[in-house]
Structure formats: C-alpha cells, structure tokens
Amino acid sequence: MKYLCLVYSDEELLHSLPESPRDEECLAYAESVQESGRLIAGEALAPVQTATTVRVRTGKTTVTDGPFAETKEQLAGFYMVEARDLNEALRIAEGIPPARV
C-alpha cells in the first residue's frame, strides 16, 4: 500500500538549531529508504517565501504570493513510500530527520 508522509517544519526554528537535520542527513535517510525498495518519490519543497497560492472560485482564478494562511509550520517536503501496512509506514516516517525537530 502507498503512504504519503508529509514533512512539516518551522523554517526559522529548523535553521536556528545547531543540531537540526541538515540536507546531508535528509538525503542519506532518503537514500536508505530508496535502497530498501520502499521509496516511491520524495522531495524537499522550496522555502515558504517562494510560495504562490492559486484558487479558482466560480470560474475565476486568483493568484496570490505566499501561502494561503499564516502558520507556524510549513509543508517542507514529502516521502511517498510503499509499506505493508500503517505500522510499517509509521516506522519509516519516524525516521525522517525533521520529525525530531
């Protein structure tokens, strides 16, 4: 079964902590999940400052800069994995480095 693990983080907090996961650690973890045959896809997303929100209401498209809502945490990336069941997917998700922050 496929599971989508969403990675949320507070960008300011993540980059201010001396022990926060760095790109190398995240890439190494993604590589280990890929080598296990469980990774279908995974990507880090661009910083929230580059976000654009697109909405369509009653046939009219509205485009605004930035995320739709002010939040403390932002969607920072994702892992799509193949797992036997939810428990295996949870074990994979708990190993994602930013999950510790």
How would you name each of these model-derived features?
Residues 1-101:
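Conserved, structured core segments of small domains
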